[in-house]
Amino acid sequence: MAGVNVCIKCSMFIFNFVFWLCGAIILSVAISIRAGKIGQEILAPGDADLNLFIAVNILIFVGAVIMILGFLGCCGAMKENQFMMILFFVGLLMILLLQVAAGIVATTRKSKTEQALNKTLLINARLLSSTDENERVFQKAFSELQEELKCCGLVNGASDWGSNFQHYYRTCECPSESDSSCTKYSGKTIYKQSCFASISQMFSKRLFIVLALAFGLAAIEVLGLIFSIVLYCQMRKK
C-alpha cells in the first residue's frame, strides 16, 4: 500500500497554519470593531432600526471557527487522522458557504448599512447635550475620541455639546487659531470639523478589511478542500 505523500502532508500543515493566522486576524479586527470604543461606547447607545453589528458578529464567529479548523487541520495532517480530516473538510465547506452568503448580503446591503450607521450617529449626537447623569459615560468616551480624531462634536460641530461645551471643550481645542482646520466658538479655538465623517470612515475601513480578508480566504479554502480530500484518500489507501 502506498504511504501518505510527504509533500502533500507538509503543504497541508503549512496551509492550515496560514489559515489559522488569517482566522486570528479576522477575529481580532472584528472584535476591535465590536468591543472597541467606537462600537461599544459611541455607536451602542443609539437604537438604530438596523443592527450594525450583525456582519461583525458573524465574522467573530467565522474567525473563531477558522482558528479551530486550522488547528484541527494541522493535527489531522501531522497525525494522519482520518476522522480529523473529515471534520476539517465538513467544517471548512460550511465556513466557505457561510462566508460567500455573508459577503453577498454585506455587498447588497452596503447602502442600508451606511444609512443605519448615519442614523445611529445622528441619534447619539443628541446625547452630547444631555444633562442626564446616565449619559456621562458616553459623553466622556466621545470627548476622548474627539481629541484623538482632532474634531469637535458629532454632527453639527461644537454646538452638539450645548451647555456641556464648557465642560468638554478642552478635547476640542485647536493648537493654533491660524490653522485652517480651526475656528472660534464661545471664545475658544476649536476644531471646525465634526467627528461624523471620521467615525464613518474608521468604521467602514475596518469593516472593509475584515470583508476583504474573508473573500480572500475563500480561494484559499477551496485549495484546503482539495488538499484535505487528496490527503484523506491517501490515508485510506495506506
From Swiss-Prot:
Matching entries from SUPFAM superfamilies are given as: Tetraspanin (SSF48652)
Provide the residues annotated with a glycan attachment (glycosylation). N118
Instruction: Check the record and name the Pfam families matching this protein.
Output: Tetraspanin
Side Cytoplasmic, residues:
1-9, 73-83, 232-238
- Main site of residence? membrane
Which parts of the chain does the record assign to the membrane side Extracellular? 34-57, 110-206
Which UniProt keyword terms apply here?
Cell membrane, Glycoprotein, Membrane, Transmembrane, Transmembrane helix
GO-annotated cellular components: plasma membrane
The protein's matches in InterPro entries, at most eight in alphabetical order, are given as: Tetraspanin/Peripherin, Tetraspanin_animals, Tetraspanin_CS, Tetraspanin_EC2_sf
Q: What does this protein do?
A: Structural component of specialized membrane microdomains known as tetraspanin-enriched microdomains (TERMs), which act as platforms for receptor clustering and signaling. Participates thereby in diverse biological functions such as cell signal transduction, migration and protein trafficking. Promotes ADAM17-mediated TNF-alpha processing through recruitment of ADAM17 to tetraspanin-enriched micro-domains (TEMs). Forms a complex with RICTOR and integrin alpha3/ITGA3 to mediate mTORC2 activation and AKT1 phosphorylation leading to cell migration.
What family name appears in the similarity comment? Answer: Belongs to the tetraspanin (TM4SF) family.
What quaternary arrangement does the UniProt entry report? Forms homooligomers. Interacts with MEP1B. Interacts with integrin alpha3/ITGA3. Interacts with RICTOR and MTOR. Interacts with ADAM17. Interacts with ECE1.
Name of the protein = Tetraspanin-8
What is the species of this protein? Answer: Bos taurus (Bovine)
